[in-house]
């Protein structure tokens, strides 16, 4: 297999489906909000997100647990969506290749839900949070474990590159306001730990890459 193949979607890729559904949700809700408020297409208002599945601790304590899942498909604006989907498309295709569809989907949603719990526990009551970032950080954490498990040598990845990517991803969250770092870190840890449980290294996966 060529190294670049890892980043190309496989036939019937579940990762591509996840990206497609998330993008479709964003633009569908943009049209919906515009039809209700006569607003623009620059993004969603906080109130609209709150009313349609965003993370919000008081609501979850009142039994609206579905928000731990629905927030994954919501994004504040097109830049927020684009950043998450770009990383998901690139790393997700590779992780799906190594783990298979079922394990990949499990890590994605498990990490997203645990990221939501981390956000709710850490943040104040008035915090409204949305985005696939926690689930995406779970994918990053899982890929980190795969690279480490293969002694830093995996087709398409190396230990130093992956560690630098993780560091820069976490660091970026602390350089800007309005970033849910609790969700990012919780998702990263969840993905890493779940990958430790389910991943079994095969002999043909290790390969020195430049």
Task: Annotate each language-model stretch with its function.
Residues 1-210:
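A detector for small-residue-rich transmembrane helices and their helix-helix packing motifs
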